[in-house]
A protein has these predicted regions:
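His/Asp/Glu-rich metal-coordinating catalytic cores
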Residues: 1-116, 135-147, 168-170
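Proline-aspartate-enriched helix->loop->beta-strand connector
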Residues: 19, 54, 203-220
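Generic beta-strand/beta-sheet core signal
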Residues: 25, 59, 83-86, 125-127, ...
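Short, glycine-/Ser/Thr-/acidic-enriched flexible segments
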Residues: 27-29, 63-64, 89-90, 129-132, ...
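Glycine- and other small-residue-rich loops at beta-strand/loop junctions that grip anionic moieties
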Residues: 33-34, 59-61, 192-196, 217-218
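Redox- and metal-dependent alpha/beta enzyme cores, enriched for Fe-S-associated oxidoreductases
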Residues: 148-150, 161-181
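Generic long, charged, amphipathic alpha-helical segments
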Residues: 181-196, 202-203
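Conserved small/polar residues in nucleotide/adenosyl-binding loops
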Residues: 232-234
Length: 234
């Protein structure tokens, strides 16, 4: 949905020309099969948002422009305005627009203006999906955000994966929202997130195409990178 499809033909040509070393992501090396599609997330997100009749808050990684576009698309399809909350969300949106993305989406409205819309006509896309203390989601859930408030019957969609180490504070946040009568939707309950990192089969196929003489595993804990090296020898 964002950017061009992978150029398999060119990667295979590069592999035939000879590659000394390849640096590759280890994050999802323990995940079987292939990583999913953002298009599938978009379809399910639309189904989820269509059934929700109150205020919706979506929290995700600001850097995930494809997910941002999904939020804009689903807001428009469900007859809602969308408002961005959080400095990094605004910064990434501006950068994406400057690079030619998000051109065919509705214009976001200011959170202060969003307060004038009825609950079923607005969706907020905010930062803080990992429970960051100063993230917009934490401030909203603590009822200290100056422009965005949440109340019983509303819904929060955590459209992101829990980064290892953040489990305790995120589940605490989930529990607090549920206690306040707010519906919590996450990848545990609905298909609202797909990883942008390659799974095991994706990694295997890439190495078959590129055929590097050396592999440098990165982006993961030590156990991920050791497993990545083991995968190469399977």
């Amino acid at each position: 949905l964002i950017g061009d499809n992978i150029n398999e033909k060119r990667l295979k040509e590069i592999g035939e020309e000879g590659v000394l070393a390849m640096i590759c992501d280890s994050t999802n090396v323990f995940s079987a099969g292939r990583s999913g599609s953002e298009l599938d997330v978009r379809k399910n997100m639309l189904n989820v948002m269509s059934r929700l009749k109150k205020r919706i808050i979506i929290t995700s990684f600001a850097s995930n422009v494809a997910r941002m576009e999904t939020a804009f698309y689903c807001a428009e399809q469900t007859g809602r305005q969308i408002s961005l909350v959080g400095r990094s969300m605004h910064r990434i949106y501006k950068a994406a627009r400057q690079c030619g993305y998000l051109k065919n989406t509705i214009e976001p409205i200011d959170p202060r203006e969003a307060k004038n819309f009825s609950r079923e006509k607005i969706v907020y896309l905010c930062t803080g999906s990992q429970g960051e203390p100063m993230g917009a989601m934490m401030r909203i859930s603590s009822y200290v955000h100056p422009d965005v408030f949440i109340e019983k019957g509303d819904a929060v969609i955590f459209s992101s994966k829990i980064i290892p180490g953040n489990e305790k504070k995120l589940y605490k946040l989930h529990n607090q929202l549920v206690k306040d009568g707010i519906e919590v939707i996450s990848e545990e309950t609905e298909f609202v997130h797909v990883s942008g990192h390659p799974n095991r089969e994706d990694l295997k196929e890439m190495y078959q195409w590129v055929k590097p003489r050396c592999v440098i595993p990165v982006h993961g804990e030590h156990r991920h990178m050791i497993e990545h090296l083991s995968l190469i020898h399977i």
